[in-house]
Swiss-Prot record:
GO terms for biological process: cardiac muscle contraction; cardiac muscle tissue morphogenesis; cardiac myofibril assembly; detection of muscle stretch; sarcomerogenesis; skeletal muscle contraction; skeletal muscle myosin thick filament assembly; skeletal muscle thin filament assembly. Residues 145-166 are annotated as: Disordered. GO terms for cellular component: Z disc. The gene is TCAP. It is found in: Cytoplasm, Myofibril, Sarcomere. Pfam families: Telethonin (PF09470). Keywords: Cytoplasm, Phosphoprotein. One of its GO terms (molecular function) is titin binding. Gene3D superfamilies: titin domain like. Residues 156-166 have a biased composition (Polar residues). This is Telethonin.
Amino acid sequence: MATSELSCLVSEENCERREAFWAEWKDLTLSTRPEEGCSLHEEDTQRHETYHRQGQCQALVQRSPWLVMRMGILGRGLQEYQLPYQRVLPLPIFTPAKVGTKEEREETPIQLQELLALETALGGQCVDRQDVAEITKQLPPVVPVSKPGTLRRSLSRSMSQEAQRG
């Protein structure tokens, strides 16, 4: 099934008002597909020959950013469809559970109130905070890594090759 696509890119910039608009969409898709109800199949059992032919049609789909889609078979006319409005995100990012006045809202749970009070008392500081120098004193000393080429071999080259061969 062969498919050809045509994309559109529109960009506009207004430097005075510091505005920009940019849109890109797949505008036209032309695909070749088998045509329904248009196939021929012949079979000759004496000569052991078969012949099969499938009709093909070119399906055309045109989309636009204005939520209009046209589709149909090339040469037979296109049917136009108005697509329903769809949000960019599938769900709103934030929806309050209950919106109302302060009196109607439920009180904050006690555990959450205590946690919030503790965070405000600490002011974002860790009680057990240590300086980096104190932490590095507790670590073992750093040993420089030797270069791989300077390692001494315990076996000669011929011995190590024999060990690899088994």
